[in-house]
Amino acid sequence: MAKVSRQAYAEMFGPTTGDRLRLADTGLMIEVEKDFTVYGEEVKFGGGKVIRDGMGQSQRESKDCADTVITNAVIIDHWGIVKADISIKNGRISNIGKAGNPDIQPGITSVIGPGTEIIAGEGMIVTAGGIDTHIHFICPQQIEEALMSGVTTMIGGGTGPATGTFATTCTPGPWHIQRMLQSIDAYPMNIGLLGKGNASLPGGLREQVDAGAIGLKLHEDWGTTPAAIDCCLGVADDTDTQVAIHTDTLNESGFVETTLAAFKGRTIHTYHTEGAGGGHAPDIIRACGESNVLPSSTNPTRPFTVNTLDEHLDMLMVCHHLDASIAEDIAFAESRIRRETIAAEDILHDLGAFSMLSSDSQAMGRVGEVIIRTWQTADKMKAQRGLLPGDTNRNDNFRVKRYISKYTINPAITHGISHVVGSIEVGKYADLVFWKPAFFGVKPSLILKGGSIAAAAMGDPNASIPTPQPVHYRNMFAGIGQGIRHSSLTFISQSAMNANIRDAYGLEKQVEVVKNCRSITKADMIHNDWQPNITVDPETYQVIANGELLTCEPAKVLPMAQRYFLF
C-alpha cells in the first residue's frame, strides 16, 4: 500500500491524530485527539480532487444531503480537539464525522450531493462563535467590530450613547426594550437584552421581562441594595431568566457578606468578579467560591500587564460619570484598582474558578478583544505557572479546553441559550469561526452565522482573484439584506414569546427563548467549576485561596499583539 509522510498528509488534508499545532504566536500547543475522517477516503474540493460527480459527490437530492460541508477541519471545543468533516443542514450542524459519497465510499456519515457547497477546512481551525455577555450597547458599530473578531452572540443592555448606558448594561423599561429589539433586527448578530434590575418591588421588573428582556442587570449606579437584589432574583425565578450583577463598590448598603446573603442561594452571574470593573472593595473576588455564583471577568484586566493599573483610572472616571476635581470621586476610582486582586484573577482563571470572560464594551472593555485577551491570559499563565494537571509536555489540550469554554459554552449555559449556541454539536446553530493556526484568536478568516457566511477577510473586490490587497473584514451575504433575518437570532424570554412580541413589534429575525437559567450552579460551568474558599486582606489586598497566596508578576510582553497589528 502506498503511504505518504505525515508532513505531506498534513499539507494535503490537514493535521491528523497525534499531529500538533501552535496557536498563533503563543506558547500553547494543541494535539489532535481523534480523526473522524477515513484514511484513503478523504474528501477535498478542487481541480483533480475528490469532490466530483460520481466520486466524492453522490447523485442524491438535497433532502438527503448536507447544504454545506466543511472538509477536514480541526475542531477546538470544550468536548474535544478533533479532526472531522462538519456538515450543515438548514442552518444547523447536522453531522460531525465523515462526509462523502456512500455509494462508493465506506464510513460515510454525511452525504455530499449536487446541492452541497464546500468550504475547505484543510489546515484550518474551526471554533464555535464567541459569546460576549457584558455588552453596553453604546453604539451599533460595536456589533460589526465584535463579529469581525469571532463573536457571534452579544448579551447586554443599553439604548445608545446615553449617560445611563455608558455606565450600566441595562435597557430600561418596555419602551426602550421594544425600540432596541427593532433596531437589532438589522444586524448579523445573535442578541439578547438585559433590563434594569434595580427595584424593590417586582412590577417594574416583570414588565421588562414580558417586553422581551432575557434577564435583568443589577448595577450599583442604580442602587444595588439587598432589597433590590432579593426582588430582582425573585422575578428571575418566576420567569426563568438570568440576573447579572455589578455590586456595591462603596459598601454603602452592606459588605460582600450582605450581598451574598441577599442571594439566598439563588443563581446569579457576577460581572467583573475581580472588582476593577466594580463591586465590593476590596473583596468581591470572594464571590467566585460560592456554588450559586457564576463568575465572569471583563477584558480590561486580562491579562495582568505592566500597563493594566495605569490605564484603569481614566477609564473609570469616564465610564462612571466621575469628576476628577472631586476628591471623593478620585477615591472611589482608586478603591477599585488593586494590583493584588488583578494578579490573583489571572491565577483564578487558570485554575477554573472564574468561569467566563467578556468585554464590558466601551465601558472599560474592548468589544473586539474578548478572544484575544482570553488566549493572552492562557499563554501568560502557561509561561508563569507551567502545565496544568491533565496536560503533558506534548500538548496543552486541557488548558485550551478550559479557556475556550470561558467565551463559548459557559456563557451560553449561564444565560439559557446553550440549547442553541455555544459549541460545535449536532443540532446547534451553525455559528462557526475559521482560523488559520498562525492567526488563531487574532484574525479569523471566515465567520458563519446560521450556516451562511456573514463576514470574511476579503481582498479587493475588483481584483481578478479574491486575495489581493487591501484585505480587510467585510460583511458577506449572510450579513446583508434578508440574509440577516434568516441567519441570526434574537433571544427573548418565555413570557415575551407567549405575548407574541415578534409580531407585535414587527420583528423579522428568528426568535429563540432562553431557558434553564435558574437550575444551574457553578458545577455546571464546564472546565471552570472550582469553588475555592477565598479571603482578601483588607489592608494589603493579598488574596488567599484555600490557604494559598495567589500572586503573579505582570507581563511585559504579550503574544497576539504588535506582531499582528500595525496600529
Curated annotation (Swiss-Prot):
Substrate binds at H219. It is found in: Cytoplasm. The active site is at H320. One of its GO terms (cellular component) is cytoplasm. Its main location: cytoplasm. It catalyses: urea + 2 H2O + H(+) = hydrogencarbonate + 2 NH4(+). Heterotrimer of UreA (gamma), UreB (beta) and UreC (alpha) subunits. Three heterotrimers associate to form the active enzyme. Belongs to the metallo-dependent hydrolases superfamily. Urease alpha subunit family. This is Urease subunit alpha. It comes from Polynucleobacter asymbioticus (strain DSM 18221 / CIP 109841 / QLW-P1DMWA-1) (Polynucleobacter necessarius subsp. asymbioticus). The gene is ureC.
